[in-house]
Amino acid sequence: DVESRGLGDVYKRQMRLENLIKDTQDEMYKKIKEGRDMEDAEAKKVADVVAISALKYGDLSNQASKDYVFDIDRFTSFEGDTGPYILYTIVRIKSILNKYKEQGGDLTAVKLQQPGNASEKELAMELAQFNTMIATAGEELAPHKVCAYIYDLANAFNHFYHETKILGEENEERKQGLVALLVLTRDILETCIDMLGFEAPEKM
């Protein structure tokens, strides 16, 4: 009958989803173990968290009205427009902030300053677009716009990271300004991934 056919379809879809999650978790575990010195249990825990980000980001980064092909290699890549790339960026920022605290720095005392170099200005400009992006994405019910924004923000941060001496900055006031920029970037990225329904691990 129609009801049993409907339940059968639901069951099949659920099984496909469970298999998809399992396959993605296995792929993430393999990639994490290949590139990092991490205990098996910790690698499994991190892989499970990152796999959810890979699936959710991969799905939500596409417009709801458009079909897409699931590509496990692309979705689980640590490079490009993917969930793992976003999470890796967040973990990188957290690592720098933890080192700053270990050196005696106080994250609550840092203040934003006028941007210095070009990559710093680029990052500040991306951060300044957050409120407008959230308003637009909310009005249009368009999570793909949140994904596009955090991808651009992650790119801007990583460019800034490679161009700028942060913890090695000798001018203490400027160092605090750079750290404040990192705090704001972390907070906005974490706010956005929370909206998208996933979280970042403490390390990757």
Stretch-by-stretch model annotation:
Residues 1-3:
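N-terminal low-complexity segments that are often proline-rich with Ser/Thr-Pro
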